[in-house]
Amino acid sequence: MSQTVAFVTGATGHQGGATARELLKSGVKVHALVRDPSSKSAIDLQRLGAHLFPGDFDNPSSLKAAMGGATAVFLNILPVSSDTNREVIHAKNIIDATIASGTVTTIVYSSVTMAGRHEEFPNWGPDYPLAWYWESKAQIESMVRGSGIKYWTILRPAFLMFNYLLPKASYMFPDLVRPRAFLMAYKPTTAMTILDGSDVGKFAAAAIVEPSAYNMHEIDLGVESLTPAEIVRELSRVSGKDISLQFYNEKEVEELALTDLRIQSQVWTNEVGYQVNFKELEKYPIRLTRFAEYLEKHREEVLKVLA
C-alpha cells in the first residue's frame, strides 16, 4: 500500500495544526506551506515530523513544490475582510495546484456551519452584513465538489472554542479580558453551537486516512449549544473568577452593527445561528470535546484571559 502524503494548508494555525498533528500520529507524511520556516510554530511543526515548504497561497511555484507527491489535501482558508475576494482566489490557486499535481485523490475542505444556506437567512440580499463571507464559503464548496478529485469531504465547524482564549478573545470578547465582563449583542436566550477546533483535525484526518468512508460527506460539526449564561458559568467555574454577564440594548446593537463585524456576527447568531444535528454526528466514530472538558484542559489559558 502506498504512503499517504497530505498537503495541509494552515498547518501552523488552529485547524490545520490539529489536522497535521492527527495525521502525523497516524503515520501520514505531512507537507506544509509556511511563510516563515524560522517561526516558532513552523519549527514546532517540523519537530513533529512535517516537511516544510517556504511560500504562500499567492505563489503557484511554492504551491506546486508543497504539493509534490501529495495524495491528499486539507483545505482551510482564512477570510480577509480587507480583501473580500482573497479567500476564493487562494482556494482556487490551491485547488488548481491539486488538480495539476496528478497525484492527489482526496481533498477535505473545512468550511463553516450554514455555508450554502445563506439565501435562507432573514433579509438576505447584496447588502446583507458579511454577505461576502457566506458567498465565498459557498463558492469554495462548489469548487471542491466540481474539482474532479476522486474523494472529497466538506466539514462545516460551528463556533470554535479557542475564541474564548487568547489571542482571539481579545478581539471576540474584549470585555471578557478586561473588565472581566461578558458584554454581548447576543440575546439571553440565544444558544451558541460550539466546537473544539482539535475535533476538526480528528474528522479531517479520518477523511484523509479512510477517504472512501467519508467520500461526498458534508458534515456539520458542533458538540453542544450554550446560552451566554451557561458559557459564563463554565468560564467562572474553571477560573474561579466572577464574570459579569451584560447585554447591549437594541439601540446600542443597531448602532454598533453598522460598523462592527463582531457585532454583526452576534446579531446573525440571534437570527440564524449555527444549526447542527448532533444526533447525525453519532454515526461517526469520533468523540467530540464538550466545553467544560475543553476549558479544564486549557485552564491555564483561561486564567490568562481573566487575569
Predicted regions and their residues:
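N-terminal Rossmann-like NAD(P) cofactor-binding module of classical short-chain dehydrogenase/reductase
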Residues: 67, 71-74, 108
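Oxidoreductase cofactor-interface core, primarily capturing Rossmann-like NAD(P)-dependent enzymes
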Residues: 2-43, 58-61, 78-89, 97-106, ...
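Basic/polar N-terminal segments that are highly enriched at the extreme N-terminus
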Residues: 1-4, 305-307
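General small-molecule cofactor/ligand-binding pocket signal
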Residues: 31, 51-53, 155, 244-248
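Residues within well-ordered alpha-helical secondary structure of globular protein domains
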Residues: 69, 206, 237, 297-300
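Conserved Rossmann-fold cofactor-binding substructure of NAD(P)-dependent oxidoreductases
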Residues: 43-70
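A hydrophobic C-terminal alpha-helical subdomain
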Residues: 214, 239, 249-307
